[in-house]
Amino acid sequence: MLGDNVIPADSYGGPDQRRIIEGTKYNKKKLVKRCHEGKAWVVGLLPGMKSKHTNGFQGELEKTVMKEENVDFKDFKIEGASELTSLGMHRPLAQKINDLEWKIDEKGFPVFDFWLHKGTYATSLLREIMKSEDVTVY
């Protein structure tokens, strides 16, 4: 938790992307409590042109990966196509699946019903459920 970035819940109970809190020795106990209560989430960097690396060990990992992949924050600015430019943000590393229900339809296919907070990808969840070796089936 020390050095991790955490975002608190917004007024709807989902992750508040506008408030990034760095875990320190002073707030660690409270942040751990809030994360266990589902009122805060540890987040990872989704890089963009206005991003800054996280402090501490996490930031060193970010720098290492970006260097190995030959990626820089400025690479996320797309000249002449501003709609493709990414400013950067943080996303929860784990998220609760809400109201998950499933059934098998009349053709024998599974049907899932659930909802996720804003910024969480249903395709990622379904990929984890399907666990196919063939990435083209998603």
What residue spans do the PLM features occupy?
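Non-catalytic, substrate/partner-engaging modules appended to enzymatic cores
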Residues: 1-138
